[in-house]
Amino acid sequence: MKEFLRKKNIIFSAKRYGIDALGAMAQGLFASLLIGTIISTLGEQLGIGILVTVGGYAKGATGAAMAVSIGVALQCPPLVLFSLAAVGMAANELGGAGGPLAVLVVTIFAAEFGKLVSKETKIDIIVTPFVTICVGVLLSLGCAPAIGAAASTVGTAIMWATELQPFFMGILVSVIVGIALTLPISSAAICAALSLTGLAGGAAVAGCCAQMVGFAVMSFKENKWGGLFAQGIGTSMLQMGNIVRNPRIWLPPTLASAITGPIATCIFHLKMNGAAVASGMGTCGLVGQIGVYTGWVNDIAAGTKAAITEMDWAGLVLICFILPAVLSWAIAIPMRKCGWIKENDLKLDL
């Protein structure tokens, strides 16, 4: 049996599933949902309709892109790899807020089952896609909704935190939503489902920015400009493989979010009154910042805000960019010196 599995390149390994597959999935997410979001946002802000259309198609391929990228990491044969596109679409759609996590779990099973039967029959072109797709879609129907429901429980903690005083609410919402953004679940979907706007939305934006900008800046030594942009306006989920290897690298941006959250709520009174989904997007395509600005404009039109002040702009820039960068970088320095963060712990394969 061991020899058969070895021949099929099926290796039951925490590294292969928890690091290689997870890291590849994050790249698939970037190459579809996140780049699509950036393209769509550019189109909306510049009034170029074709870019909005292009971005929409890119975002629509999210599940397929993640699944295929996982298949590449698992070294799947061609027919298995191509079949995973359908599996990813099913898992992502049925997984809801836990879509990326559902894609990861389901795709691993579907890929390994597909590899088991690959080249074992004379009608391989039928058997291999049939097994891969059936296993993946049936698993998606059975477990993806449960994974989505589990991911949505994060919303319960967020809603509890929103009922606290602004200081503690700022800390908890910022930290929880920021962590959700980096995990293979959808912070944007959670925020949209909770209609998270207002002061709590501002705290959520702060937490997401702390993760994205924090990782981008503290890993600049390893990843240079490519990593700065990929994480800073893309996603901090790219670091999940490295986080599994060394969870300590998550401390600087998470601590930064615990600081910027209450500053956003108590000092700058930063509110996100745009579309709720923007609360969970952070600096991805600058959607979070555009959401805050849109909220200001809407509030002025509704008569609940007199004007956009210099304090508003200062708060937005400090909370979303400057403070996360400075705090994460400063916290990471002693951690590097004491060996908690080692050389290349933050390195990305870009």
Language-model segment annotations:
Residues 1-350:
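Pore-lining transmembrane helices
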